[in-house]
Amino acid sequence: MTKVGLRIDVDTFRGTREGVPRLLEILSKHNIQASIFFSVGPDNMGRHLWRLVKPQFLWKMLRSNAASLYGWDILLAGTAWPGKEIGHANADIIREAAKYHEVGLHAWDHHAWQARSGNWDRQTMIDDIARGLRTLEEIIGQPVTCSAAAGWRADQQVIEAKEAFHLRYNSDCRGAMPFRPLLESGNPGTAQIPVTLPTWDEVIGRDVKAEDFNGWLLNRILRDKGTPVYTIHAEVEGCAYQHNFVDLLKRAAQEGVTFCPLSELLSETLPLGQVVRGNIAGREGWLGCQQIAGSR
């Protein structure tokens, strides 16, 4: 039996309003619990369009057929008008998710975090995280115990900033296995549970065709030597590609693969490491990557 952490990122208003309810229904039918990370502030995701001037981002948008994958409402959100606030407008949906699944913070403003957090000072970062946590806690009526940095934009600055909130774990980076990042003080910080597997948009049209993706991914899962963690998006697997996700769950069950919330992957003893800036094939720009202590 292979156990895989299932992480669901919710980036947009439409993903919350339409994608999450569909995913909740699918997961219920398959008796699966997951970790769902919500963006709760303004939906300004359309402001990423300026990144089309970067060849790597343009190629990603073309090979993943972004217009049909996400929809024009997502691609244009917050461009010519202020982005709609996601959280309180979809509070009932978020509360429903929290009844059955582990719920954490993805971001206050997903676009702002992904585009600008790498240049923020620590207090600006702390204030932004606090705003998101406060909003999510108001919605679900209980403390938030986990978070996942938008776009995996995380480095030592993010690790230090999040220590102020005493969360149970964070999932801010890409890597191979859960670990504790070393702080500037030399002490181990809050546990990190890295994503180990590629997302749909990172590999479609580059490594694999859409119709072959599920078999390709299951092969990666079964060969994973670490602690497998897979991320889906409410805007993708909860909308245009929900049928592909259902097929993945059916095929996974046949292969003895089970999915669980990320917290079930934690153990009392974890290796030490760091989160450093790196690059992942198929994703434009830098992102946080796990580095085991002592390695370079």
Curated annotation (Swiss-Prot):
Molecular function in Gene Ontology: hydrolase activity, acting on carbon-nitrogen (but not peptide) bonds, in linear amides
Taxonomic lineage of the native organism: Bacteria, Pseudomonadati, Pseudomonadota, Gammaproteobacteria, Enterobacterales
First-tier enzyme category under EC: hydrolase
Family membership: Belongs to the polysaccharide deacetylase family. ArnD deformylase subfamily.
Function, as annotated: Catalyzes the deformylation of 4-deoxy-4-formamido-L-arabinose-phosphoundecaprenol to 4-amino-4-deoxy-L-arabinose-phosphoundecaprenol. The modified arabinose is attached to lipid A and is required for resistance to polymyxin and cationic antimicrobial peptides.
Annotated keywords: Antibiotic resistance, Hydrolase, Lipid A biosynthesis, Lipid biosynthesis, Lipid metabolism, Lipopolysaccharide biosynthesis
Gene: arnD
Signal peptide: none
EC assignment: 3.5.1.n3
Domain NodB homology: 2-260
Keyword Iron set for record: no
Xref: InterPro entries: ArnD, Glyco_hydro/deAcase_b/a-brl, NODB_dom, Polysacc_deacetylase_ArnD
Stated name of the protein: Probable 4-deoxy-4-formamido-L-arabinose-phosphoundecaprenol deformylase ArnD
Organism: Escherichia coli O157:H7
Tagged with keyword Lipoprotein: no
